[in-house]
Amino acid sequence: MKRVYSNKIPSKIEKDNSGYYLYRWNIQEEQNTEYNGYSYYEVTVWPTLTANKILETCINELWGTDVEAKKLNDYNAALLGVLDESYIDIYKDFLQKRKELKEQVDSDFIAYEQMQDDQIVNK
């Protein structure tokens, strides 16, 4: 997945005028001789927006569809001795990265919902 670049700091969740949402994560400030701005990963999420829908979209963009099932099958095959034990570590590594992503998405989504609630109260 390629990083996206912007001259201004992006919001983590943004509703587009077309009705879909943009979710951005791993936002990093970039400073070098050619560019000062921000880089991040970005996915398009279609309504209705939920943390699980964001996570599913991110997983599909990062690893592709059905990758989780394939890694689980390889893991089980390694447990049964059909594949070597390296597949166990590959699956554990995937689960750790997925867990970290889920925690980030959940945190960002809670903050987004709170911001939306605050805007409704302040109207």
Where are these regions (language model features)?
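A preference for well-ordered globular domain cores
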Residues: 2-123
